[in-house]
Amino acid sequence: MAGNDNWINSYLDAILDAGKAAIGGDRPSLLLRERGHFSPARYFVEEVITGYDETDLYKTWLRANAMRSPQERNTRLENMTWRIWNLARKKKEFEKEEACRLLKRQPEAEKLRTDTNADMSEDLFEGEKGEDAGDPSVAYGDSTTGSSPKTSSIDKLYIVLISLHGLVRGENMELGRDSDTGGQVKYVVELAKALSSSPGVYRVDLLTRQILAPNFDRSYGEPTEMLVSTSFKNSKQEKGENSGAYIIRIPFGPKDKYLAKEHLWPFIQEFVDGALGHIVRMSKTIGEEIGCGHPVWPAVIHGHYASAGIAAALLSGSLNIPMAFTGHFLGKDKLEGLLKQGRHSREQINMTYKIMCRIEAEELSLDASEIVIASTRQEIEEQWNLYDGFEVILARKLRARVKRGANCYGRYMPRMVIIPPGVEFGHIIHDFEMDGEEENPCPASEDPPIWSQIMRFFTNPRKPMILAVARPYPEKNITSLVKAFGECRPLRELANLTLIMGNREAISKMNNMSAAVLTSVLTLIDEYDLYGQVAYPKHHKHSEVPDIYRLAARTKGAFVNVAYFEQFGVTLIEAAMNGLPIIATKNGAPVEINQVLNNGLLVDPHDQNAIADALYKLLSDKQLWSRCRENGLKNIHQFSWPEHCKNYLSRILTLGPRSPAIGGKQEQKAPISGRKHIIVISVDSVNKEDLVRIIRNTIEVTRTEKMSGSTGFVLSTSLTISEIRSLLVSAGMLPTVFDAFICNSGSNIYYPLYSGDTPSSSQVTPAIDQNHQAHIEYRWGGEGLRKYLVKWATSVVERKGRIERQIIFEDPEHSSTYCLAFRVVNPNHLPPLKELRKLMRIQSLRCNALYNHSATRLSVVPIHASRSQALRYLCIRWGIELPNVAVLVGESGDSDYEELLGGLHRTVILKGEFNIPANRIHTVRRYPLQDVVALDSSNIIGIEGYSTDDMKSALQQIGVLTQ
């Protein structure tokens, strides 16, 4: 046991210096790794808990406790060993609880999968089952191989990319400044540049957040930044005034504050509304240039990462434009990894990472996307396969049925497309740069400045350089690399180690997580006495990174990436491009990258000996090193941006043409198009009598504006059009007091039109918006969905003793073409809405399920149908500015209540005892309301009551009425 006591000496001082709270158990999380909840002490404890068996920790405590002599006994050592041992025990408890939970849920999910696959198998053609199994492209989508349309035949395209978090700019990117500004930022910027240079592409917009915080460069606050491509040019393509690639910064969230990605969720709808305005304006502008006056709508809206995924889904639904999605780092994969560590519970993880919001956004992205772009097959089969909305076997069968023209029973699956990431080839190495091992062909004065900044660390700068480029975060596993280097004397004698860990000023000013990792690295350098053998420069420019690769290649070194999991592996491709062989993690993208490039070795990132052995083997075997270098340079063209864009655009061409419904006969008749302000009444949490009073009082206080035509009204509800008409007739009101009705939970829009010369109720005919019907039919399951829901409804029962009673029944009277209604007998026994949505996704039925009428009715509508989306549709079609819209809601409502609150419109919450108490449909949310709605936003106000004075004051406050 004596050998296992050494960890005490290396960690105890740092733990004690951090204070009593360093590993206290009364905080919400034991070892939170992000956003100010991480300390060096916690990181050290994590290393201990991970690396040592619970029995060893317990024995160490016993030894400390057994020292009875005052000279020998160390009370602090005794206390700390006891506390760390208990942390290890708690870790095992978490692991056991999570294992039980997964074990309990797995049979249910597997049964649903089996039933669905069986349904699909019943109608397969003879021979179809066996044929699919061996075809990887049929398994879940397309790889980059195979026949596809030629990009030269593409019309001039407008493409929209979205990446919301981090610091995004075209030049001098601050990669590594924080956890949100990493490889993804570089990827989307270079993708935008490359696409804009591709044949057939007219304009690419990269939409991100405008940041006006005082501690950040002014460039992040510029509304528009033109991106200049330095890669490949298309001289034959005509360019117009608005062609090219641009970063468009949309203001949303607090104007003077930078937000981490975990805190962006409440402001997503605000971004969507701002992006809608930009896309509509730009489409019309491009149309004037190249579209003969007709708007040129985006060919695709492509979201990157979960937050941008849900934004792209909402934009796709509002505009009826195809959506693509790239997940980058998936929430379920992160959640599973954190739970396996067993250090904190699901609730604690969600508190820190808002992981439930992230996973739901990714599920919704699967629902809405036509294609999902992955970088590797492993990402599809092991990561996306964790999601309710995707399953490899079912995807294979659905793809086969589509190819055969067979019935899919209303089921849909997004196409998974494997397109490896591209890299900029502007700095590709040439053979002559490697000529001469001993003599430098260029004078020292011509060497890039960053070379001297690195070489000054080394006692012997001529040794081969092991290079790592990674942010100082635990998942990058930099400490294991330093340990592997420090513990292998032959490797230390053979090579130097260079760590490019972002830019920093002072460690004390870094975020806690980065500071902890960097402190650990410096401690290890001191412990192994690696001075003169390890370089860790404080600063470098993004433009100097290729020079750093070239320096490592000049010394005949190697690039190493031993992250626990690597999603993309762009740095590996960049290293190969500069003639540098690689040592890479065997988890993630490097596996497939190395299959293509064949330029290095793969290792287990958890095995320090394997890391050291692989590095020594590669650097000591000159023939192996040369072969890896040559293979990398020979095959690197497969990861070029032109190749990436060619594959990308060939997939975009396969998407069905869709565009917003702007134009048509009703534009000339609908009065809504001339309104300055629109008041939307969406109050669900009141009885019909209170709803009528709210309508009357609102119209009363805006009588002057209504008469002048400057203000219009929209009723937004889950009621059918016949129920709305009956309500207004019973109240003695004409339907024409409203400009439009959003009914059936957003699946229908009606306009009240006169059928005679006198304004009587009987002569007002509600005219349905046919364009809206076409707008929302995307992936609607129709009769196949209805049959499955009817079957499901028979299984939802309440039990009284031995008697089972069905509680959900089909309701044809309140159903329509795009709304399947079900009557609920006993809302208290309803399954949570999240479970119903999970079931629909497992069945590949893409729809939006809602509980309404105090959970006495279930409405199932198309995936892009909702009251919130219908409002955006009206604004786009009739040219209404969202900031001029006021939405009236109650204190609660139908299950889509949260969607009505956020955005650029003004929201008035009517508070008071007249509200029906919130029922269980709002008490079983996947995440708290405040996680997705900024209730303290200046766009949201609350009033007590709905009297005329109350309504007048509220409408004056939001600018609909003058003071």
Swiss-Prot record:
Species of provenance: Oryza sativa subsp. japonica (Rice)
UniProt cross-references to InterPro entries, sorted A to Z: Glyco_trans_1, HAD_sf, SPP-like_dom, SPS, SPS_C, SPS_pln, Sucrose_synth_GT-B1
UniProt-recorded name of the protein: Probable sucrose-phosphate synthase 2
Activity modulation comment: Activity is regulated by phosphorylation and moderated by concentration of metabolites and light.
Name of the top EC class for this enzyme: transferase
Listed GO biological process terms: sucrose biosynthetic process
Pathway where it operates: Glycan biosynthesis; sucrose biosynthesis; sucrose from D-fructose 6-phosphate and UDP-alpha-D-glucose: step 1/2
Enzyme Commission designation: 2.4.1.14
